[in-house]
């Protein structure tokens, strides 16, 4: 059962459901965030403990409340399998509003990140009315860079983000 933490709009694509996180997502989310191959491109680059993963889910719920947008849990529509997180993010201290995406290894290489990020980008433009949209990506994260470039983003500026060399990719205004 997926009881949403709060009322979060749902987005659907051909293969994905983007929905609010619920309590039943925690185990798979904690598993994903404990994987060093996932975490090496995020925040300080280290895997999250279960407690940290729980706090992150709580932050996502708070982001929806305080900002009116946030990250969605991503599941494969046919199987219902949890795949990761995708959405709009701009917590205090971030340099810009961004489209963020993190998928579990079992979802890599299938085009899910691009499909979900495209839906989030459309939501940011059409529903939120955003014109300045970015993705902040570590220089070493080639897969995420490919996703942002495939959606029309261009490298804008180099920054240090959570201690790692990163680039802000800006999506074109439409």
Task: Pin down the residues of each PLM region.
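Active-site rim helix/loop that mediates acceptor-substrate recognition in acyltransferases
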Residues: 46-67
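Acyl-donor (CoA/ACP) binding surface of acyl/acetyltransferases
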Residues: 1-41, 58, 71-174
């Amino acid at each position: 059962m997926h009881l949403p933490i709060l009322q979060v709009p749902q987005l659907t694509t051909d293969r994905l459901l983007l929905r609010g996180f619920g309590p039943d997502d925690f185990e798979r989310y904690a598993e994903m965030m404990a994987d060093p191959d996932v975490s090496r491109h995020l925040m300080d680059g280290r895997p999250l403990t279960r407690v940290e993963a729980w706090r992150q889910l709580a932050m996502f719920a708070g982001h929806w409340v305080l900002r009116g947008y946030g990250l969605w849990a991503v599941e494969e529509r046919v199987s219902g399998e949890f795949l990761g997180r995708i959405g709009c993010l701009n917590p205090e201290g971030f340099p810009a509003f961004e489209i963020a995406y993190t998928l579990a290894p079992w979802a890599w290489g299938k085009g899910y990140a691009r499909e979900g990020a495209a839906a989030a980008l459309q939501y940011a433009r059409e529903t939120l009315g955003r014109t300045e949209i970015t993705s902040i990506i570590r220089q070493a994260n080639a897969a995420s860079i490919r996703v942002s470039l495939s959606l029309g983003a261009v490298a804008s500026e180099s920054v240090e983000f959570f201690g790692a060399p990163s680039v802000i990719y800006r999506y074109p205004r439409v």
